[in-house]
Design a protein with these regions (language model features):
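A structural signal for the main folded, soluble domain(s) of proteins
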Residues: 42-55, 121-123, 173-182, 195-199, ...
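Conserved beta-strand scaffold positions in the cores of enzyme catalytic domains, especially
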Residues: 117-119, 131, 162-164, 209, ...
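Primarily recognizes the serine-hydrolase "nucleophile elbow" in alpha/beta-hydrolase
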Residues: 174-219
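Alpha/beta hydrolase fold serine-hydrolase catalytic domain that processes acyl esters and thioesters
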Residues: 200-249
Length: 249
């Protein structure tokens, strides 16, 4: 049984920082660097600045595709570690897969085993919702350790059975949608960053999980076009909750 520690609540709420105030970045090379952050609650933009500084100095983004795949696969754990170090242990730094997706039943798709699809079944399937999620361009390791835990969290929060397709070619998408249709779902959606859904299928955008959006406090990884974002675990959870809400709507 996996032990998931409960988030530690501070004895008293940390004083909130003023959004317009000047906040020096708590960088490791500075003499006044404080392990665990500082005694104040930073605004989201300043929390992000702390994480970006740490990630850029500690984990340079590789150019090689295989190395980038490994980098993105390790990103959830690294962001949790960075948030604990830079923002303090009094906040909840669990990523969505751990916070929401631990009770999801993950299984193979027996109808199409050759596709490598994974089915995420939430604990409550009474709504009869189904969806197909399309990998936005991650390599195989990042699909398994970064993307799919996010999909599991969305499945659990929304009460939607989700089939994740790692290589979303058009003919494979059509085949998986056909499998979903045979389950007689109440609704069927496609979760993707960019895709033209067939008639009768809603498109639920997952773009905020892989590229910065004005609606969330997130930064690019490396250079524009790299699949993935730097954001606090709290912001990742907010993005996942919003996607789940759109599936339920």
């Amino acid at each position: 049984m996996r032990h998931v520690p409960e988030p530690v609540e501070p004895d008293a709420p940390l004083p909130a920082g003023d959004t317009d105030a000047a906040y020096p970045v708590n960088e490791q090379h500075l003499e006044d660097f404080q392990v665990g952050g500082v005694e104040r609650s930073l605004p989201p933009a300043e929390q992000l600045a702390q994480l970006v500084s740490y990630m850029k100095n500690s984990y340079p983004v590789p150019a090689d595709d295989d190395a980038l795949d490994r980098y993105l696969a390790a990103l959830p754990d690294r962001l949790t570690h960075a948030a604990m170090l830079m923002l303090g242990s009094g906040l909840d730094h669990t990523m969505p897969g751990v916070a929401y997706g631990m009770d999801v039943d993950a299984r193979e798709l027996p109808e199409l085993p050759e596709l490598g699809a994974r089915v995420f079944v939430p604990t409550d399937t009474s709504a009869g919702r189904w969806a197909v999620s399309l990998n936005p361009g991650f390599g195989p390791r990042a699909v398994e350790h970064h993307w799919r835990p996010l999909i599991a969290a969305i499945a659990q929060l929304s009460g939607t059975t989700i089939i994740d397709l790692p290589d979303p070619r058009d003919r494979d998408v059509a085949a998986v949608l056909d499998v979903a249709a045979k389950q007689r779902p109440s609704t069927t959606a496609i979760i993707a960053t960019q895709h033209e859904p067939p008639d009768g299928f809603a498109l639920i955008s997952a773009a905020a999980l892989v590229e910065p959006s004005p609606d969330y406090s997130a930064a690019v990884i490396g250079h524009p076009g790299t699949c993935g974002i730097i954001a606090t675990p709290e912001e990742y959870r907010r993005i996942v909750r919003d996607i789940a809400d759109r599936l339920r709507a």
